């Protein structure tokens, strides 16, 4: 198998970007979907509900994450600031994630027009693949890797 393109999505449902190389982990590409926008109860929200999410452009920095969006000042957060445990839910799977500074929550809430917060999966994911509990999973819907063939893409 040969990969023709490789995409990275640091924040679930936000814009992704193309990579030329990546580190493959048991949980997926390193840093992929390790951040998630959630409502006040910790339940994930997606671009299906809030289409403006796809306009948010995340970027990985040496110390954390940078977010950019139209007509907004960029904001950066540090991994080290995510120390507050937060119950979170992706579909029906409940597990612990981490919450950080309210400034980024306010930034996201203002841009999306709804009360929300940014959660981080942490260095050791508490979420495990349902079909194999030895494999960690990030905030991805259910699989660490998603592949699509060129022909299937052309059919879309």
Regions found by a protein language model. Name each.
Residues 1-156:
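Small-residue-enriched flexible connectors and coil-helix boundary/helix-cap motifs
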